[in-house]
């Protein structure tokens, strides 16, 4: 089984041992792709994934690797973006980016600020009560958005009443990726 993924024009892909590095206008993404009896290589303007095995697990792993590579191409060309929104009813919370951390102050009237790190090459922009999380790596962008959402999770309270928090309102469109 052999699968070829064509490298877009403005993108370069290199293979270093087991790691694929993809560079483009939005940055670079590196990912380790390894599975027994599957080889990944860059040949003639394409990323080639091939194997001699024909069992279900190997075929599904080849498909997974293909998805990872196409997500990397999409990330370095168009990028990935999550939209988030701040909701509060009584205590106005302030969200800011300080260094490599997202800081949420005055959540439910708390005195101590809540912090979470920004992962990888992800950028977070705060515009009033709207946040935009974007970057070239879908894993880093998604995990940063999830970390922000979990940072304001309210435990031991009825979430129908205590709806304060920062929530993901729009996820990336994975249409033809």
From Swiss-Prot:
Highest taxon of source: Archaea
A Gene Ontology BP annotation from the UniProt entry: cytoplasmic translation
Keyword RNA-binding annotated: yes
Coiled coil: none
Classification via InterPro entries: Ribosomal_uL6-like, Ribosomal_uL6-like_a/b-dom_sf, Ribosomal_uL6_a/b-dom, Ribosomal_uL6_arc
GO cellular component: cytosolic large ribosomal subunit
Any Pfam family matching the protein: Ribosomal_L6
Function: This protein binds to the 23S rRNA, and is important in its secondary structure. It is located near the subunit interface in the base of the L7/L12 stalk, and near the tRNA binding site of the peptidyltransferase center.
Subunit structure as annotated in this protein's UniProt entry: Part of the 50S ribosomal subunit.
Family statement: Belongs to the universal ribosomal protein uL6 family.
Database matches in HAMAP family: Ribosomal_uL6_A
This protein's name: Large ribosomal subunit protein uL6
Lineage, broadest ranks: Archaea, Methanobacteriati, Methanobacteriota, Stenosarchaea group, Halobacteria
This protein's encoding gene: rpl6
């Amino acid at each position: 089984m052999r699968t070829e993924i064509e490298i877009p024009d403005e993108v370069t892909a290199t293979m270093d041992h087991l790691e694929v590095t993809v560079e483009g206008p939005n940055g670079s993404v590196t990912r380790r792709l390894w599975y027994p009896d599957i080889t990944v290589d860059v040949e003639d303007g394409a990323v080639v994934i091939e194997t001699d095995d024909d069992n279900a697990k190997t075929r599904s792993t080849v498909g997974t690797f293909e998805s990872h590579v196409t997500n990397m191409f999409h990330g370095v060309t168009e990028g990935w973006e999550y939209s988030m929104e701040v909701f509060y009813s009584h205590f106005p919370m302030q969200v800011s980016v300080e260094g490599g951390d997202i800081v949420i102050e005055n959540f439910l009237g708390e005195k101590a600020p809540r912090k979470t790190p920004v992962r990888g090459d992800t950028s977070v922009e705060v515009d009033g009560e709207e946040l935009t999380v974007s970057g070239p790596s879908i894993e880093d962008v998604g995990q940063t958005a999830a970390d922000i959402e979990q940072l304001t999770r309210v435990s031991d309270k009825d979430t129908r009443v205590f709806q304060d928090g920062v929530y993901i309102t729009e996820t990336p469109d994975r249409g033809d990726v």
